[in-house]
Amino acid sequence: MRRISLICLLLATLLLVGCGARFDVTQTGYLDTKTDRHYTALSAAFEAAARGEEVGVFEDEKNGRVVTFYVIPNADASRFLTDEDGALYCADAVEPDASLWAISRILVCEEDAISVAVADIEDAAVINEIARVWFESQKDELPLESATTVRRLKMASKDFPGIYYCINYYLYEDGSAYFYDMTTRRAILVPAALGEQIPLE
């Protein structure tokens, strides 16, 4: 009985080691040693819509760091993976250009310990105007005071299922509103007429 238990323990250990050895770190990302695909982390503006099954682990024993990789439901696993924090990794050399997306839906989310969708924008005219203002407008400066309401707009495209392109929406006490990307620190003043069409709850 003890021999069987020991064999089971050894097999479990080998499985864990094998899984953890699948990914190696590189100067620019992670290498899947089984498929020989190299994945690079995208900017925080890109998020996985959900997390599927685990595909591998990178373990840095020296620093005690572990990164677990997962497939993204409905997304092409040969191109995109995610981790336990929802970060997106891409096997392509070039980051997706969200300005070229045919955006079909925008989730309006409240961000706290978890992200909760409070509204859903499916009106094509509103979606197109949000995209136009964000991608085509000149950069502005955020007000110095804190926003009274903060939402995260998650844009979805049928061309990239399972993946969101995200920007923040800040509403201030004086009624002004801004789109904002925390990674690039790009801020865009939202026209009042458009702000009235963005549901906050």
Question: Where do the PLM segments sit?
Answer:
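Positively charged n-region of N-terminal signal peptides that target proteins for export
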Residues: 1-10
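C-terminal motif of bacterial Sec signal peptides marking the signal peptidase cleavage site
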Residues: 15-18
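Function-determining sites in protein domains
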Residues: 20-201
